[in-house]
């Protein structure tokens, strides 16, 4: 995980700063990222029960659109052919903490931060989509529920997280480029 972040950080640095960061600045970026990530993650973990409730409810609402017989009780979504339990790991708090840490460390002003918050909300709803997709698949194929949880769950996360991160970085790059042009 750390080496992946280092590679991504250097990709970010090379792509968006033309390789102008010193080794000290790179290390400082990573230290800030990890500290902010841990703080945000622990805050989200502290509110884990509430977050589970919110994620379960929103997942249920969207699942109900495609599976009208779905029922909700606590953090369980009861489907006609299966039951899905939403636990703390399903909330996306790890993903949200990482994305928020990147945004806090990388943003240079409030506009960039607000753009980043949009991507955090998008990540939150991508996670809801992931749970709804799992509900749909495990209801259609109850005998393979674990397989669909793994494939759909990780497939969505591993596909859309890089898209969100790269999308955020590209938008910030365009914003910074247009801001620099207007100052010339």
Curated annotation (Swiss-Prot):
Signal peptide positions on this chain:
none
* Matching InterPro entries: Archaeo_ArtE, Exo/Archaeosortase_dom, Exosortase
Quote the cellular component terms of the Gene Ontology held in the record.
plasma membrane
User: What keywords appear on the UniProt entry?
Assistant: Cell membrane, Hydrolase, Membrane, Protease, Transmembrane, Transmembrane helix
Membrane-spanning regions, if any?
27-47, 86-106, 114-134, 151-171
The record's active-site residues are 90, 130
Give its localization: Cell membrane
**Subcellular location, principal:** membrane
- GO biological process annotations for this chain's record? proteolysis
Function per UniProt: Transpeptidase that recognizes and modifies its substrate by proteolytic cleavage of a sorting signal. Following cleavage, a covalent intermediate is formed via a thioester bond between the archaeosortase and its substrate, which is then transferred and covalently attached to the cell membrane.
What is the name attached to this protein's record?
A: Probable archaeosortase E
* Organism, as annotated: Methanocaldococcus jannaschii (strain ATCC 43067 / DSM 2661 / JAL-1 / JCM 10045 / NBRC 100440) (Methanococcus jannaschii)
């Amino acid at each position: 995980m750390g080496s992946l972040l280092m590679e991504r950080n250097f990709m970010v640095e090379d792509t968006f700063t033309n390789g102008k960061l010193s080794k000290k600045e790179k290390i400082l970026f990573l230290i800030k990222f990890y500290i902010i990530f841990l703080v945000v993650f622990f805050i989200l973990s502290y509110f884990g029960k509430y977050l589970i409730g919110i994620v379960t409810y929103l997942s249920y609402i969207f699942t109900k659109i495609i599976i009208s017989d779905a029922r909700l009780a606590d953090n369980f979504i009861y489907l006609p052919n299966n039951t899905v339990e939403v636990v703390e790991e399903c909330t996306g708090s790890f993903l949200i903490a990482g994305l928020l840490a990147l945004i806090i460390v990388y943003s240079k002003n409030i506009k960039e931060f607000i753009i980043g918050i949009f991507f955090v909300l998008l990540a939150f709803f991508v996670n809801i989509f992931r749970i709804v997709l799992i509900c749909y698949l495990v209801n259609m194929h109850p005998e393979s529920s674990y397989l669909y949880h793994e494939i759909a769950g990780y497939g969505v996360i591993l596909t859309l997280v890089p898209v969100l991160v790269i999308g955020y970085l590209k938008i910030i790059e365009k914003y910074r480029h247009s801001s620099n042009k207007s100052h010339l």
